[in-house]
Every structure is written in structure tokens, then in C-alpha cells.
């Protein structure tokens, strides 16, 4: 699979060529809202260079509100409809590599272990993912501390590197090679490959924290005092979960309108008090301390035990957006540092 170059002034032609064969999904700004991953429409100008803050690909693969079943009892008989996403080939562009890796975490939840979510699977099965490494790394990233990021490339179909006036297009699968074969792409020169490698090394070294990857799931402690410290600051707004590209907690709700009942899936978070409230009234997590502990131990220990992947990809959104400045990097440094393990 040969690496390619795409000049930025050829991107509109590249997108048009993609749109002729695929439904193209990319971050789009509409109005004053942050860029969201949407299926491109005529007149859209997608942000595919990773230069701006954006919502996550999760919002496309696992919508914030999705009707799963409709039941209508009009006329005395019940009709049942299960609205499914369209079955069509898609290409996703403009996802930061940490966000693209987060799709792998979602895959473990919704496609593995003998359970397949048909709604998620329909969007995912014909989706080619093209990740992006931007020209400048975000200050909040800490990807290199979490995993062997070298392996992340194998989990996407191609990686685009922003080299200023052009993108370096590196296919990593047969799907990616098919995209690279589009006529707008040219063969990469050795100097371009060197520039790409420099950018890749910058990405891998961004936000390195003082602990080894294994420490994430070996050094977390149930009784660590840090959980109470987090809980004292946390206001349980749920932002860290809702903006996380890999958090997948959801709730099921029924809504009645006349003779029609819709059952839909919507966002939820383990940081809300009623998340673990049971039907008979018992709640095993009545304070914020166990809820704060659950979220981090689930992401960094339990998901690794269950699926073999860490449930965080270091995208830094929770660092940037937490209203009370709980910095997960500081928490991990305190709980997982190799110095602590050796003491």
C-alpha cells in the first residue's frame, strides 16, 4: 500500500470523488455550535485537518437520542416498527487519532463478547475511518501515556498527516488503499515521509505522564484517598462522560404520543445519582465518592480486564471542559505513577 499526498487545494475534488462512492461523514460547523460529525450535505465545508475542537465520532455512531422501537395501537391492533440506520458504505474523515481509537473501545462494547447491537453495527460495518494527525497537538492530549499508540494505526483504515499545504495520506488497510487510489492523490516523496515521521513522533510524545502503560490497570487502588478529593470538587454534571469519545453508558426511555409509543436510547452517565438506583429503591452508590471511583476504575482497569483495551484514549476533552478543573492527568499521575508503585 503506497503512501500518497493530497494537496489542500485538491481537497474539494477529493471530497467530491469520495461522495460519488460513499456517504462522507466529517466534522461540520453549523451555526454557532461546535463542529459535529455529520453526513455531508451540499454546501458543507468539513473540518478535516483536526485544527478545531469538535464533538466526538461517538455522536454519529451512537446518537445522543435514537428511537429503537415504535409501537402504534391505532385501530385496535398493534403495529411494530424498528427504525434501522441505512445500510450504505461510509467514510469518516477528520477524526483525531485518539477519537478513532475510541471507536475501537465502542466496538468492544457493542460488537464483541457474543452481543451485537444491530443499530451500532449497521453504522459501523461499512464505515472506513480516516484519522488525522493535526499540524499542532492539543495541549490537553496525553495519548502516549495510555497505550502503545503505534498499534492505533492498525485500528483505522488510513491516517492523514497535516503537512501545511498538503496532507500525507497513509493507508493502513485495503479500504484505506482504495481511498488512496483516487485520482486526486499523488505519490509521496521521501522528504514528505520524513516530515510525516517527525509529526508522528510529536504525536507519540505529547503529554507523556510519569507512569508506564501497565500501571494504569495495576496500580489503581479501591481505597485511594484521591476518590474523596475528586468527589469534593465534582458537581456531577456528566460533562466528562458525555464529551468522552469512548464512554457508552445509556438509558432506555418510553414516550407515549396518542396511540404511539416510542422506545428510545439516550445518553446516561455513572456520575448521576440515579444511574444505579434500583427498582426496589436501593442505590449502591449514594455519594459521589464511589461514582467518581467507578468511572475511572472502569475506564482504566475493568475495561482492560474485560476487553483488553484501556477505555481512555487521552483526547483531553474532560481536561479542557471540566467546570471545576478536575484534571484526569493529575489524578492518574497520583494513582498510577511508577514512583508510587515502587514506594
Describe the residue ranges of each PLM region.
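Non-catalytic, usually N-terminal nucleic-acid engagement modules in DNA/RNA processing proteins
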Residues: 2, 12-111, 117, 121
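Short, flexible loop segments at the rims of nucleotide/cofactor-binding pockets, characterized by
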Residues: 2-4, 219-220
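N-terminal basic/disordered segments at the start of proteins
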Residues: 7-11
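A short Gly-Trp-Pro
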Residues: 18, 22, 55-63, 67-77, ...
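Glycine-rich anion-binding loop/nest that anchors nucleotide
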Residues: 95-97, 133, 316
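Short alpha-helical basic/polar micro-motif
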Residues: 96, 238, 242, 320
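Catalytic cores of enzyme domains
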Residues: 101-237, 241-272
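Ferredoxin-type iron-sulfur electron-transfer modules in oxidoreductases and energy-metabolism complexes
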Residues: 211-232, 250-343
Amino acid at each position: 500500500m503506497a503512501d500518497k499526498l493530497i494537496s489542500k487545494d485538491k481537497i474539494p475534488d477529493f471530497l467530491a470523488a469520495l461522495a460519488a462512492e460513499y456517504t462522507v461523514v466529517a466534522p461540520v460547523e453549523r451555526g454557532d455550535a461546535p463542529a459535529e460529525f455529520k453526513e455531508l450535505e451540499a454546501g458543507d465545508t468539513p473540518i478535516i485537518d483536526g485544527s478545531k475542537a469538535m464533538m466526538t465520532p461517538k455522536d454519529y455512531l451512537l446518537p445522543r437520542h435514537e428511537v429503537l422501537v415504535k409501537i402504534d395501537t391505532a385501530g385496535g391492533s398493534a403495529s411494530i416498527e424498528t427504525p434501522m440506520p441505512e445500510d450504505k458504505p461510509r467514510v469518516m474523515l477528520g477524526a483525531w487519532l485518539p477519537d478513532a481509537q475510541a471507536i475501537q473501545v465502542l466496538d468492544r462494547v457493542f460488537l464483541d463478547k457474543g452481543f451485537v447491537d444491530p443499530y451500532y453495527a449497521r453504522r459501523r460495518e461499512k464505515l472506513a475511518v480516516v484519522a488525522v494527525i493535526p499540524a499542532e497537538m492539543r495541549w490537553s492530549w496525553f495519548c502516549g501515556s495510555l497505550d502503545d499508540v503505534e498499534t492505533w494505526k492498525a485500528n483505522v483504515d488510513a491516517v492523514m498527516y497535516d503537512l501545511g499545504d498538503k496532507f500525507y495520506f497513509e493507508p493502513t488497510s485495503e479500504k484505506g488503499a482504495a481511498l488512496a487510489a483516487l485520482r486526486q492523490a499523488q505519490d509521496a516523496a521521501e522528504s514528505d515521509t520524513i516530515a510525516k515521521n517527525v509529526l508522528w513522533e510529536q504525536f507519540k510524545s505529547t503529554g507523556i505522564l510519569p507512569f508506564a502503560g501497565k500501571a494504569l490497570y495495576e496500580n489503581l487502588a479501591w481505597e485511594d484517598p484521591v476518590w474523596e478529593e475528586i468527589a469534593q470538587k465534582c458537581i456531577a454534571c456528566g460533562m466528562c462522560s458525555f464529551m468522552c469519545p469512548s464512554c457508552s453508558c445509556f438509558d432506555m426511555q418510553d414516550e407515549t404520543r396518542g396511540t404511539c409509543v416510542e422506545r428510545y436510547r439516550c445518553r446516561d452517565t455513572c456520575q448521576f445519582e440515579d444511574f444505579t438506583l434500583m427498582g426496589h429503591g436501593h442505590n449502591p452508590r449514594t455519594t459521589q465518592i464511589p461514582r467518581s471511583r467507578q468511572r475511572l476504575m472502569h475506564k482504566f482497569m475493568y475495561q482492560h480486564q474485560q476487553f483488553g483495551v484501556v477505555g481512555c484514549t487521552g483526547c483531553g476533552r474532560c481536561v479542557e471542559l471540566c467546570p471545576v478543573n478536575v484534571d484526569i492527568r493529575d489524578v492518574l499521575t497520583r494513582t498510577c505513577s511508577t514512583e508510587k508503585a515502587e514506594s
